[in-house]
Amino acid sequence: MSDEAVAAIRAGKAVILPTDTVYGLCADGYREAPALRLFQLKGRPESMPIALLAADVDVILDAVPELRGRAGVLARALLPGPYTLVLPNPSRRFRWLCGTTPEKIGVRVPELPPVARALLDRVGALAATSANLHGAPDPASLEDVPAELKEGAGAIVDAGPLPGTPSTVVDLTGAEPVVLREGAVPAAEALARARGALGR
């Protein structure tokens, strides 16, 4: 399955992958067209951001070198884990992922199931969003993924049931961390970890 999923990503197709929270709908993050296909498949407005997902923080830092420094310290303190971190993107890289805020980028480095980790190690960073129709419940299993997304995917990677609670989204672009969405990690814990990384 890993070879099939790698081939699908390299061909510009979407794939359905397990993460540490829910099943994700992913595509090559380095190219605009495959990433935009994710918006079309799930009916998500392109004005709304999606994440750049990788197996390791170093992959994210290589993709967005401006994150080295304060943002990199914060990323290493919180990742890998069930977080989406919103970080500064001064060079406006990966604009197709950033919606109406290209000066910010959301990144994910999950605690991946081994089958997904093996895939990410081969393809680098992916554009990623949850494998549901826009506004629908997050999928904790492949049975929860809509048929139209399965039909539109070039490959599907099954890791069985997942926790089903989405990542906690933390905005780290300002002087103080802000929780934008409470998910798998309680807001108070997320803020405490972020402030601890800043020495506060």
What are these regions (language model features)?
Residues 1-200:
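Active-site-adjacent structural elements in enzyme catalytic cores
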